[in-house]
């Protein structure tokens, strides 16, 4: 599971302290002007891990997490912030991460959206978030009505899931699963990056399996 060295943990602790201190100043400025401050946890999250002991001290109003998989949904929902938002794939770009067409000739973004949603949905049934969204260039969707229809269906399912959670907590088997590794709480529900970036490591497969199972995970 890519265990850290002592030197790396010391460096990360130093960076987390530095980033939290500087970020708090910026968040205070935002709040001073009556606005809310959200953090986008993905492209560059050095020092900003949501399960880190300093994350709450920054005072963010929400966390936005780009998701491919169920464990990423649980990571977002697990963070101690008022609002949790998932940023769905595919992104509204002409090509995907692997260079294949998405919102361009030959692309089938509606199939991509449904495939990712299946992984996300099973996790959301266990633990909810407040909001969902997309990122990229909105005008690219104009020539892909099947994608727009798919997103409308996904949004309806998401609203249903939110309502189910409001009606009551999901059933949980009398089973507690503990995940223990050298990262400790810092890497709760994650390892390093997305599933396709770390799929050679057993921990990410364990996290993804647990993300949608009706068990108590610690």
Each predicted region: which residue ranges?
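Glycan-processing catalytic domains of CAZymes
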Residues: 1-218
């Amino acid at each position: 599971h890519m265990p850290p060295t002592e030197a790396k943990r010391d460096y990360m602790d130093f960076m987390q302290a530095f980033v939290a201190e500087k970020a708090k100043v910026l968040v205070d400025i935002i709040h001073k002007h009556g606005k809310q401050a959200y953090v986008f946890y993905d492209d560059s999250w050095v020092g900003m891990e949501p399960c880190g002991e300093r994350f709450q001290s920054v005072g963010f109003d929400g966390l936005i997490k780009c998701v491919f998989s169920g464990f990423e949904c649980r990571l977002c929902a697990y963070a101690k912030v008022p609002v949790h938002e998932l940023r769905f794939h595919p992104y509204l770009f002409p090509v995907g991460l692997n260079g294949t067409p998405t919102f361009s000739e030959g692309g089938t973004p509606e199939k991509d959206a449904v495939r990712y949603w299946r992984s996300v949905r099973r996790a959301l049934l266990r633990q909810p978030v407040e909001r969902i969204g997309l990122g990229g260039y909105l005008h690219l969707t104009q020539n892909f009505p099947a994608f727009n229809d798919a997103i409308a269906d996904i949004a309806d399912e998401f609203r249903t899931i939110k309502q189910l959670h409001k009606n009551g907590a999901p059933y949980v088997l009398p089973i507690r699963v503990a995940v223990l590794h050298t990262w400790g709480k810092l890497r709760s529900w994650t390892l390093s990056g997305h599933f396709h970036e770390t799929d050679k490591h057993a921990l990410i497969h364990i996290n993804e399996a647990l993300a949608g199972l009706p068990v108590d995970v610690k």
